[in-house]
Curated annotation (Swiss-Prot):
The gene is Rnase1. One of its GO terms (biological process) is response to bacterium. The active site is at 37 (proton acceptor), 144 (proton donor). Substrate binds at residues 32, 35, 66-70, 91. GO terms for cellular component: extracellular region. This is Ribonuclease pancreatic. The lineage of its organism: Eukaryota, Metazoa, Chordata, Craniata, Vertebrata. It comes from the Eukaryota. GO terms for molecular function: lyase activity; nucleic acid binding; ribonuclease A activity. It is found in: Secreted. Keywords: Disulfide bond, Endonuclease, Hydrolase, Lyase, Nuclease, Secreted, Signal. It catalyses: an [RNA] containing cytidine + H2O = an [RNA]-3'-cytidine-3'-phosphate + a 5'-hydroxy-ribonucleotide-3'-[RNA]; an [RNA] containing uridine + H2O = an [RNA]-3'-uridine-3'-phosphate + a 5'-hydroxy-ribonucleotide-3'-[RNA].
Amino acid sequence: MGLEKSLILFPLFFLLLGWVQPSLGRESAAQKFQRQHMDPDGSSINSPTYCNQMMKRRDMTNGSCKPVNTFVHEPLADVQAVCSQENVTCKNRKSNCYKSSSALHITDCHLKGNSKYPNCDYKTTQYQKHIIVACEGNPYVPVHFDATV
């Protein structure tokens, strides 16, 4: 009886392992948002090469140059709190976007027109603007940077 059980459980174990294992190394949407958009310290934001450095450091120039990106220089908790602020319609017409109640310190990175991969060259511009983020999950956290206003 014990051998029969193990003959059934052994393949089930590997089936389950094959199902769970691929997600172990995968970045969640919330983690991707943090990697691509959060820089609370903003240590080198005054440098004209800030975007070039950060886009490379945060893996947004692998294989191609990401055309536009925004970094937020506020504590993560403050950005996560946006998910409980004013509900607005997202650019894609979904209803899970939220607008910050106050202007936040941000840096916009725009790929320069003559720039080509692998030499991604970005224009760095600092602003204080309201941000709009899409939120999902439990806990309800930012998973997509939608816009600034």
